[in-house]
Amino acid sequence: SINQWGSVAEDLGGSNVEVTNIMTKTNVEAHDYEPTSQDVAKFGTAKVAVVNGARLRPVGHQAAQPTKATLVTAAETAGIKEGDNPHVWFSAKVRNNTADAITAAYQKADPSHKDDYAKLNKEWHAKEDQLESKIKDFRQDRGPAVRRHRIRGLVPGRRPQDDRRHSEGYAQASANESEPTPADIKDFQDTLKAGFIKMFVFNSQEANSTTDQITGAAKDANVPIVELAEQMPKQYTNLLDWMSALVDQFAAAVK
């Protein structure tokens, strides 16, 4: 489905597999994506289908059900249900479980290369372990941060009291996927100007006039901005490199 899971599938399959991503344009809003007839047809020839699950548009579920493809649903590998936070690739547990599920699916579909898939799985987990070690070294209380959209899990932490007191309206509107009121926006801008927020995390795929106001206020207040996305940006070739780069960006933002 989305390209970050396609990159994991490629890493785990090596030269033995051919991976086709359904969503290839990184500027497309994944929540609103509607599959074309060509997209559905691709599932008909697949032996393994990897989809995100949770609230992210269930394109893969709909298209893969009539086929014989083994379906790997990333969210479900960690017990995340439909309606939960869909940005599951930020979770180490989901990444690890999904990788193992993909490997098992490959070994079932192509048993003659079972050992190859086991070796690639081991190599992938070694890289994932390096990423988790990097995150562990960074994960500590770095001060208040407010997110523009609910993308969590990479560097989790509590939301400090100053954040709740000064920007609760905006944060609540974002959590409910509704638009903040003018008063909420002003409160947030004032919070940024007052120096209560040390870092602003922004979903670049949901940019609009409201976020422009907030990011503008953050820049004016010299608050570091870290951009996240719901699909892996073009400059990265695999999910783990993208996650590692984000950790570097967070580290630079809080120096």
Predicted segments with their positions:
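Extracytoplasmic metal-acquisition and chelation regions
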Residues: S1-K255
